[in-house]
C-alpha cells in the first residue's frame, strides 16, 4: 500500500446532487460537468455513479474525455465544451458524442462527415453572451447563422447554450455581478424568442451553473450545468446559510518518521528550510 493516497466519498457526491436538485424547478435537467478527470476525482468511476443517481447528461472538455466516459460504461448524452477538430470527427459518431458548434465552417465539416456516414448527429450551438470565450458573437445575423446550421443535413441542433461570465457573485460586487448575469440571461431569452418567432424550436436551452441556478432561479431554463459543486466546492460568496456542500475528496498519508532539529538547523535539499 502506498504511503499517501486520496479517498473519494461517493456519499458526499450524492448529498451534493441532492442539495442541487432541491433548488431546481420541476422538469429542469441536470448536466454534470466531469472534465479534467472529474476535477481529479476519477473520470471512469464518478460519472458511472452519477448516472446511477439519475443525472441527465455529462459535460467534458474534448472528445477524448468523452471516449473515456463511454468506455467506462456511461450511456447518457455527453456534451463537449471545447471545439472539435477534424482529427476527432470520427469519435463523435463512433462514441455518440455531442459537439459544441459555434461557427459555420466547423458545422459544415461535421455535417459532411454525418452525410458520408449516413447518420444524424445531435449538436449544441454555443453563443457568447458576455464571457468572451467560445460561442457565436451575439450581433446582427446571429439568428441567421444558427438557422443556417439548423438546416445542414446530418445535424440536429438539440441545444443552444452560453456561459455566465461570473455567476458566483463576489462579496462587495453583488450589484455588478448580478446585473451582468441578468443581462446575459436576457440575451439568451431574446434569441430564443427570435428563433421561435421563425418557427424554430430548440428542445434544450441552458446557461445556468450551480451558483446561477441557486441565486437566479429564472435562469435555469431547460437544463443546469453543475461542476465543482458536485465535489463540495464553495460556489459563491453569498451562499445562503441553509445551503452547504460536502467535500468529496480527502488526502491521507502515513507518518514515515519524526526527528528533532536543532535551532538554526536546516533540512531538505538546498537547505531551503531553516528552523
Indicate residue ranges for each PLM-predicted region:
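Active-site loop/helix belt of alpha/beta enzymes
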Residues: 2, 36-48, 113, 122, ...
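Glycine-rich anion/phosphate-binding loops
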Residues: 98-108, 138-144
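A charged N-terminal "starter" segment
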Residues: 1-98, 120, 156
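Short, well-ordered alpha-helical microsegments
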Residues: 66-67, 86-89, 107-108, 142, ...
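Short, acidic/turn-prone active-site loops that include or flank metal/cofactor-
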Residues: 64, 82-87, 104-107, 127-129, ...
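Active-site-adjacent beta->alpha loops and helix N-cap segments on the catalytic face
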Residues: 66-68, 107-113, 117, 179-183
Amino acid at each position: 500500500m502506498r504511503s499517501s493516497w486520496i479517498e473519494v466519498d461517493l456519499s458526499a457526491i450524492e448529498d451534493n446532487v441532492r442539495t442541487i436538485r432541491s433548488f431546481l424547478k420541476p422538469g429542469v435537467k441536470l448536466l454534470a460537468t466531469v472534465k479534467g478527470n472529474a476535477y481529479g476525482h476519477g473520470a471512469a468511476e464518478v460519472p458511472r455513479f452519477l448516472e446511477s443517481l439519475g443525472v441527465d447528461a455529462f459535460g467534458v472538455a474534448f472528445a477524448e474525455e468523452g471516449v473515456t466516459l463511454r468506455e467506462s460504461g456511461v450511456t447518457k448524452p455527453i456534451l463537449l465544451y471545447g471545439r472539435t477538430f477534424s482529427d476527432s470527427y470520427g469519435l463523435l459518431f463512433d462514441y455518440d458524442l455531442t459537439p459544441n458548434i459555434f461557427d459555420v465552417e466547423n458545422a459544415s465539416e461535421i455535417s459532411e462527415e454525418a452525410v458520408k456516414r449516413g447518420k444524424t448527429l445531435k449538436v449544441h450551438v454555443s453563443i457568447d453572451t458576455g464571457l468572451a470565450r467560445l460561442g457565436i458573437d451575439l450581433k446582427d445575423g446571429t439568428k441567421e447563422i444558427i438557422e443556417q446550421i439548423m438546416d445542414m443535413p446530418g445535424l440536429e441542433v438539440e441545444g443552444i447554450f452560453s456561459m455566465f461570465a461570473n455567476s458566483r457573485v463576489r462579496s462587495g460586487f453583488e450589484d455588478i455581478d448580478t446585473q451582468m448575469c441578468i443581462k446575459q440571461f436576457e440575451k439568451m431569452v431574446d434569441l430564443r424568442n427570435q428563433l421561435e418567432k421563425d418557427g424554430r424550436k430548440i428542445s434544450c436551452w441552458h446557461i445556468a451553473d450551480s451558483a446561477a441556478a441557486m441565486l437566479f432561479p429564472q435562469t435555469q431554463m431547460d437544463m443546469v450545468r453543475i461542476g465543482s459543486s458536485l465535489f463540495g466546492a464553495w460556489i459563491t460568496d453569498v451562499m445562503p446559510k441553509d445551503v452547504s456542500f460536502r467535500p468529496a475528496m480527502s488526502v491521507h498519508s502515513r507518518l514515515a518518521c519524526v526527528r528533532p532539529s536543532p535551532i538554526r538547523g536546516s533540512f531538505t535539499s538546498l537547505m531551503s528550510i531553516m528552523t
